Curated annotation (Swiss-Prot):
<protein>
    <recommendedName>
        <fullName>Serine/threonine transporter SstT</fullName>
    </recommendedName>
</protein>
<dbReference type="GO" id="GO:0015825">
    <property type="term" value="P:L-serine transport"/>
</dbReference>
<feature type="topological domain" description="Cytoplasmic">
    <location>
        <begin position="239"/>
        <end position="299"/>
    </location>
</feature>
<keyword id="KW-0813">Transport</keyword>
<keyword id="KW-0812">Transmembrane</keyword>
<feature type="topological domain" description="Cytoplasmic">
    <location>
        <begin position="2"/>
        <end position="15"/>
    </location>
</feature>
<feature type="transmembrane region" description="Helical">
    <location>
        <begin position="300"/>
        <end position="320"/>
    </location>
</feature>
<dbReference type="GO" id="GO:0032329">
    <property type="term" value="P:serine transport"/>
</dbReference>
<feature type="topological domain" description="Periplasmic">
    <location>
        <begin position="321"/>
        <end position="331"/>
    </location>
</feature>
<keyword id="KW-0769">Symport</keyword>
<keyword id="KW-0029">Amino-acid transport</keyword>
<feature type="topological domain" description="Cytoplasmic">
    <location>
        <begin position="67"/>
        <end position="83"/>
    </location>
</feature>
<feature type="topological domain" description="Periplasmic">
    <location>
        <begin position="37"/>
        <end position="45"/>
    </location>
</feature>
<feature type="transmembrane region" description="Helical">
    <location>
        <begin position="16"/>
        <end position="36"/>
    </location>
</feature>
<keyword id="KW-0472">Membrane</keyword>
<feature type="transmembrane region" description="Helical">
    <location>
        <begin position="180"/>
        <end position="200"/>
    </location>
</feature>
<dbReference type="GO" id="GO:0015194">
    <property type="term" value="F:L-serine transmembrane transporter activity"/>
</dbReference>
Length: 414
């Protein structure tokens, strides 16, 4: 009987929920650090390997995803989605801005292996802008080797637009390459429970259990900022659009879209749920059939919050001063990063190095920040996806209702 059950148990562990596996790895890492400090330090190699794999795959991931997305864009879509697209972009930027304010009000720090002496922080907005411009003109091979994500992004956008004029075979090849890289990322992330087990064990063994409080505070800041956006910022944007009480619509979207997204942890997987909710709300089919998939790709308020909060936590840890113009620029960069986070589990975490580049933070340190993100990702990723996906249907409904009101008022005047 035991021999029959064991393969089933192993299969469930290997192919089960990644969230549950990460939670198990987190708990086991804490227990090992509490029971045996030497053993916990030894298994730190697992965490090092996991971070190394992430660092290896992240640059090519950004290049292929952005290039394939632009190259395969379909022309001639006759739908009125401009107001919705504007809400998507405004909502994402507002979320990043709220995250900056929240991070300044409740500053967090991380436990990293490098100090401020290892980097050359920019002195202000002028130096930041100069660094951004110089990063844009980097050699593409050099950008990939050194993890210069801004340079990678520029080359990906340029190649994507150039490939729009290519034949379908070329576009299909780029798309297949993007899918292949995405598969590799998913494969790496399947090892997240083992990597997190090693990271948590070695971190607690070397820094003590007080590290947990630092992560707990960071998680409170992240989730608190997401709640602020969901219950304050988004309702304000919806009220501005429909000019009436936004909370019935906001709460409906959170209940019937956000709850599902919280457990699926995938905006793409939640598209059918959002489509059904749009149909229930009697929205224009030609509009939401385009805006919902589009939102699952570019409407990333939760990702913008994650990128901003974790980047500023790294900045605070390294003692880098941040002035107001630089903080505003970070909001813009985080918004752009968030729009490239779709389609990949943990995508927002893998784009944190791009924002960290603004402050002269090396790729090695930035990937340590990504690893911290994976440790708290059990709850962070679920909350992020719930905010992202529920906002897709919320802004679609707001824009459609505003258009219906406009048409009704025009009919009354006539």
């Amino acid at each position: 009987m035991t021999t029959q059950r064991s393969p089933g148990l192993f299969r469930r562990l290997a192919h089960g929920s990644l969230v549950k596996q990460i939670l198990v790895g987190l708990v086991l890492g804490i227990l090992l650090a509490w029971i045996s400090k030497p053993a916990a330090e030894a298994v730190g190699l697992l965490g090092t390997l996991f971070v190394g794999a992430l660092k290896a795959v992240a640059p090519i991931l950004v290049l292929m995803l952005v290039m394939a997305s632009i190259a395969n864009h379909q022309h001639g879509q006759k739908t009125n989605i401009r107001p919705i697209l504007f809400l998507y972009l405004l909502g994402t930027f507002s979320a990043a801005l709220a995250a900056v304010v929240f991070s300044f009000a409740f500053p967090s720090t991380l436990h990293l292996s490098s100090s401020a002496g290892d980097i050359s922080p920019p002195s202000g907005i002028v130096e930041v802008m100069r660094g951004l411009v110089m990063s844009m003109v980097s050699n593409p091979i050099d950008a990939l080797l050194k993890g210069n994500y801004i340079g990678i992004l520029v080359w990906a956008i340029g190649l994507g637009f150039a490939l729009r004029h290519g034949n379908e075979t070329t576009k299909n090849l780029v798309n297949d390459m993007s899918n292949a890289v995405t598969f590799m990322v998913k494969l790496v992330i399947r090892f997240a429970p083992i990597g997190i087990f090693g990271l948590v064990s070695s971190t607690l063994a070397t820094t003590g259990f007080s590290t947990l409080w630092g992560y707990a505070q960071l998680l409170v800041v992240l989730v608190g900022c997401m709640l602020l956006v969901a219950l304050v910022v988004n309702p304000l944007l919806v009220w501005w659009k429909i000019r009436r009480n936004p909370f019935p619509l906001v709460l409906l979207c959170l209940r019937e879209s956000g709850v599902y997204a919280f457990f699926t942890r995938s905006s793409a997987a939640n598209i059918p749920v959002n489509m059904a909710l749009c149909e229930k709300l009697n929205l224009d089919r030609d509009t939401y059939s385009v805006s919902i998939p589009l939102g699952a790709t570019i409407n990333m308020a939760g990702a913008a919050i994650t990128i901003t909060v974790l980047t500023l936590a790294a900045v605070n840890t390294l003692g880098i001063p941040v002035d107001l113009p630089t903080a505003l620029l970070l909001s813009v960069v985080a918004s752009l990063c968030a729009c490239g986070a779709s389609g990949v589990a943990g995508g927002s975490l893998l784009l944190i190095p791009l924002a960290c580049n603004m402050f002269g933070i090396s790729n090695d340190i930035a990937m340590q920040v990504v690893a911290v993100g994976f440790i708290i990702g059990v709850l962070q990723d679920s909350c992020e996806t719930a905010l992202n996906s529920s906002t897709d249907v919320l802004f679609t409904a707001a824009a459609c209702q505003a258009e219906d009101d406009r048409l009704a008022n025009s009919a009354l005047r006539n």
